[in-house]
From Swiss-Prot:
Bifunctional serine/threonine kinase and phosphorylase involved in the regulation of the pyruvate, phosphate dikinase (PPDK) by catalyzing its phosphorylation/dephosphorylation. It catalyses: N(tele)-phospho-L-histidyl/L-threonyl-[pyruvate, phosphate dikinase] + ADP = N(tele)-phospho-L-histidyl/O-phospho-L-threonyl-[pyruvate, phosphate dikinase] + AMP + H(+); N(tele)-phospho-L-histidyl/O-phospho-L-threonyl-[pyruvate, phosphate dikinase] + phosphate + H(+) = N(tele)-phospho-L-histidyl/L-threonyl-[pyruvate, phosphate dikinase] + diphosphate. ADP binds at G153, I154, S155, R156, T157, S158, K159, T160. Disulfide bonds: none annotated. This is Putative pyruvate, phosphate dikinase regulatory protein. Keywords: Kinase, Nucleotide-binding, Serine/threonine-protein kinase, Transferase. It comes from Allorhizobium ampelinum (strain ATCC BAA-846 / DSM 112012 / S4). It comes from the Bacteria. It is an enzyme of class 2 (transferase). The keyword Nucleotide-binding applies. GO terms for molecular function: ADP binding; ATP binding; phosphotransferase activity, phosphate group as acceptor; protein serine/threonine kinase activity.
Length: 273
């Protein structure tokens, strides 16, 4: 019998920072130890245009959708689109709000992110989230010097969820894919401010996770090589060599949770450079 864990996509859509939703999703996922969620976190989704872009991404990598959206019309839009796509969805807050209303009476009004105190720390986190979402997967490469952290790594080394976790702690984080024969942007090497960290994992782990990604969405790869362990080993060799050449620290995420990877990065930031 094969012992390999099954992977599934877990899409988390929030109109705020997403912390509440991440906790709920992980609390549920941990009850299924033989299934491993591939988290996709979409914070600050507050209008139909943003929601539609998210749902297009979900359509390419179907899975379970959890969302905390206070606006009833936007929540209804997400629910209907999930039905059209054919994926299960749960509005995590709605049953709780319904119970509160039944006991306390109708809401005066619904407030996005009302659980967060509007202080300097909160606004720093929102600024970090905005920066991180704008600089996901190599986007907006011209201003990496404004980042606190830049994560580099081959496809499926948890760069995006780690970036969002760090952003939720007020750390502006960009991430860039390492693709052999595709040079990294010169702006990265010119940046003096950020800590640059390489993320790696074992070939087996990456192959398993990549096997659950729709190959048509992957650029820069021959589909036959994308999940091939020998090809992945070559990608990892290139990534390690690149990080060693530039003296960038490397973290192996194979057996680390997102929280553990983020904690290791935060510890690296605390060290003199």
């Amino acid at each position: 019998m094969e012992n390999r864990k099954n992977f599934f996509h877990l899409h988390l859509i929030s109109d705020s920072t997403g912390e509440t939703l991440i906790s709920a999703g992980r609390a549920a996922a941990v009850q299924f130890p033989h299934s491993n969620p591939i988290e996709h976190v979409y914070p600050l989704v507050r209008n139909r245009r943003q929601a539609d872009a998210v749902l297009q991404s979900i359509d390419k990598e179907p899975g379970i959708v959890l969302y905390t959206i206070v606006d009833p019309e936007l929540a209804d839009f997400i629910d209907r689109r999930c039905i059209e796509i054919g994926v299960p969805s749960v509005n995590v807050l709605e049953p709780v709000i319904g119970t509160f209303q039944a006991y306390l009476g109708p809401l005066a009004r619904r407030r996005v992110g009302a659980q967060h105190v509007m202080n300097a720390d909160y606004f720093a986190r929102i600024e970090a989230l905005n920066y991180t979402m704008d600089h996901d997967d190599g986007q907006m490469a011209e201003d990496y010097d404004q980042a606190d952290v830049v994560l580099v790594g081959i496809s499926r080394t948890s760069k995006t969820p780690t970036s969002i976790y760090l952003a939720n702690r007020g750390i502006k984080t960009a991430n860039i894919p390492i693709v052999p024969d595709s040079p990294l942007p010169e702006s990265l090497f010119a940046a003096k401010g950020p800590l640059i960290v390489g993320l790696i994992a074992t070939s087996d782990r990456i192959s398993q996770v990549r096997g659950h990604r729709e190959l048509g969405t992957v650029s820069g790869f021959d589909p036959s090589d994308y999940t091939d362990r020998a090809s992945i080993a070559e990608e990892l060799k290139y990534a390690r060599s690149l990080c060693a050449r530039h003296n960038w620290p490397v973290i192996d995420v194979t057996r680390r949770s997102i929280e553990e990877t983020a904690a290791a990065i935060i510890a690296l930031r605390a060290k003199p450079r």
